[in-house]
């Protein structure tokens, strides 16, 4: 929980299960609030139609990061706010907490 700060954007690398590197994408989250046992976020809307191709490890991340920053400044987030509880080993929550990193 300590690594998450309210107001910062974090990314989480997510595979689509197709078995190719090109299918690995990044989800972006704005942390909106947090409690002792949970964090709340809004997901930044990122679509292949906007960027022309799926975001993957081989993509120009700096260029994409600027696009995310621009969109985040004008507030393009999904309306719904999500939360995740304290991680437990072996759960999806554990994976989220282990691999989510701040966008710098």
Where are these regions (language model features)?
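Short, cysteine-centered beta-strand-loop-beta hairpins and adjacent loop/turn segments enriched
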Residues: 17-23, 48-55
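Short, solvent-exposed secondary-structure boundary/capping segments
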Residues: 37-46
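Intrinsically disordered, low-complexity, charged/polar segments
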Residues: 49-104
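Short beta-strand-centered aromatic/proline hotspots
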Residues: 25-34
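Short, solvent-exposed coil/turn segments at beta-strand boundaries
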Residues: 4-6, 33-36, 77-80
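Short coil-to-beta transition motif at edge beta-strands of beta-rich domains
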Residues: 1-19
């Amino acid at each position: 929980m300590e690594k998450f700060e309210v107001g910062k954007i974090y990314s989480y690398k997510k595979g689509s299960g197709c078995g190719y590197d090109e299918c690995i994408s990044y989800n972006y989250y704005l942390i909106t609030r947090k409690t002792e046992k949970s964090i709340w976020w809004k997901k930044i809307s990122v679509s292949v139609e906007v960027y022309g191709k799926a975001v993957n490890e081989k993509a120009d991340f700096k260029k994409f990061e600027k696009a995310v920053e621009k969109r985040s400044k004008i507030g393009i987030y999904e309306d719904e706010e999500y939360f995740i509880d304290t991680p437990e080993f072996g759960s999806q929550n554990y994976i989220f907490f282990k691999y989510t990193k701040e966008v710098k």
